[in-house]
A protein has these predicted regions:
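Positively charged n-region of N-terminal signal peptides that target proteins for export
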Residues: 1-2
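Bacterial N-terminal signal peptides
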Residues: 6-15
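Proline/serine/threonine-rich low-complexity linkers at boundaries of modular beta-sandwich domains
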Residues: 20-46
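Short beta-strand segments of immunoglobulin-like
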Residues: 51-56
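Structural beta-strand segments of beta-rich domains
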Residues: 60-64
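Aromatic-Pro/Gly-enriched surface loop or interdomain linker
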Residues: 71-81, 89-96, 145-186
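Extended acidic/polar, glycine-enriched regions
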Residues: 73-74, 84-86, 101, 107-109, ...
């Protein structure tokens, strides 16, 4: 009897521990190999883009602005970064093949070397499901005929709280962003 009680307690405790932690549950899913979601060269400017916001809450819509060389078609797939059995990411949405747009030149500031592409038009959107698990997401954009890149963004769950705080280095990502010909380190 005692052994049955201990086994029952362990099973119930394990179930509720995993059930109450959506991130642990999500990361236990099978993932996609890096050969599917990775990009060989993040400085490949044949296709490049950004999200309208770096951080969005579940239920919001992320808006992408994407420049595609020669206006070629492209695919857009959304992945969540996580453990996933060592695969590193899991496909969350496939927006399919989209028509590419050659965007106007960004507004440059020669004194700082910065380039502002806020004048680009919206290329695609993704409505973040209300059930999405918080974390780092990437949109892999892949141009027909070659070229791929990532657009990183964070999905939050504003209804939850945690003892753990994780800050993503988006300022560092921007500093190393070489789009337009140079980064902060060139």
């Amino acid at each position: 009897r005692r052994l049955l009680f201990v086994i029952f307690y362990v099973v119930v405790f394990t179930f509720f521990s995993f059930a109450q932690n959506a991130i642990v549950t999500e990361n236990a899913n099978a993932g996609n190999p890096i050969s599917e979601w990775g990009v060989p060269d993040f400085r490949d400017n044949r296709i490049a883009g950004f999200a309208n916001k770096m951080s969005l809450s579940r239920g919001e819509t992320v808006r992408f602005k994407i420049n595609v060389q020669s206006g070629a078609n492209y695919t857009l797939r959304i992945y969540r970064i996580g453990y996933y059995g060592g695969n590193g990411a899991r496909l969350m949405a496939n927006l399919g093949t989209l028509s590419g747009t050659v965007q106007p030149s960004g507004i440059s500031d020669p004194s700082t070397g910065s380039l502002d592409c806020g004048n680009w038009s919206e290329s695609a959107t993704w409505a973040i499901p209300g059930s999405a698990v918080s974390g780092l997401y990437i949109a892999k954009i892949e141009r027909s005929g070659g070229g791929s890149n990532h657009i990183a963004f964070i999905v939050r769950n504003d209804a939850s709280n945690s003892d753990l705080y994780l800050q993503f280095p988006d300022a560092t990502w921007q500093a190393y962003n070489g789009y337009g010909g140079n980064s902060m380190y060139d």
